């Protein structure tokens, strides 16, 4: 399902992210501008997204969401790589289609997480010896994703992926609603930076 970068209605313009509907049932509305009634614009966006099969709709962008509840808050976290503990685990770059399948399973319940139909650039499996313990994605100096496939191995997965970044500072985004991840990053001493994305839902 294709996204609509420019959805124009009588009351404004928005971008509709529809690609997550087939798997997650979620559509994302990014308000670009309102030149009439905000509620009128959102109502038109809702109608289109529902007709495309959306069960849940999340909102962001240039609008007043004070009457909405926060669905996901993505915060920048950072830590000098030298501050991370050593690990025997190793991250190995992969093009194996299993990566996308496992990623989608791991992040199915994480708000605003994307779905992969193919293996992206910078995809890694994390091994302890010959045992697969996790997966992740590295983009430059940022860990774009990390997931443990074995309970209690999140720290090892993170440290193994950190060895693959460019630069000396490990950067990542963390959904504040993903409490296990928040606890892990807090325990390692990651700083809390700016909120990069915030998504809302109707109350």
Where are these regions (language model features)?
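Acyl-donor-binding surface of acyltransferase catalytic domains
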Residues: 30-88, 196-201
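Conserved acetyl-CoA-binding loop-helix of GNAT-fold acetyltransferases
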Residues: 37-48, 150-165, 182-187
